[in-house]
Amino acid sequence: MTNTKVRTFSAKIAYASRELAIEERIKVKDTRDAESLEKISRDGAQILNIVAYVVLDIHNEMSEDKDYRQYVLLDKDGNKYMTGSEPFFNSFEDIWEELEDAEVPVEQRFFKIYQRPSKNYAGRNFVTCSLA
């Protein structure tokens, strides 16, 4: 009889904005050392030079929502930032695609990460972005 370990957590790369080396693929799936976009923008806007991003499909048996997505942004210094915010990612991806179409080098892609008051939930903010 085989002792099979049941995995309670998994992260799979659903999309990467560029080809990743094996070491990068392994590192980007480990988000424990990634900074939360919500936390870094809480006290004011942050300007980040994002050079790549990854969409992760997460399965977590311990979570109320067992299957969800996380978005990981990589800056020019190798720092990782993450969020699960779909509205943030929609804004980010729209800007990224425009920059790609215009062939703007990643070294020149600066994003302003900030929070705005929610129109749907009084007293709450949400993280968003714009081109810096």
Where are each of the predicted segments found?
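OB-fold ssDNA-binding interfaces and closely related basic DNA-contact patches used
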Residues: 1-76, 120, 128-132
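Short non-domain terminal segments
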Residues: 7, 86, 90, 108-109, ...
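GIY-YIG-like beta-to-alpha core
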Residues: 81-95
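Short nucleic-acid-contacting surface segments enriched for D/E, G, S/T with interspersed K/R
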Residues: 91-112
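Short, charged beta-turn/beta-strand-edge "cap" motif at the junction between a beta-strand
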Residues: 103-104, 113-132
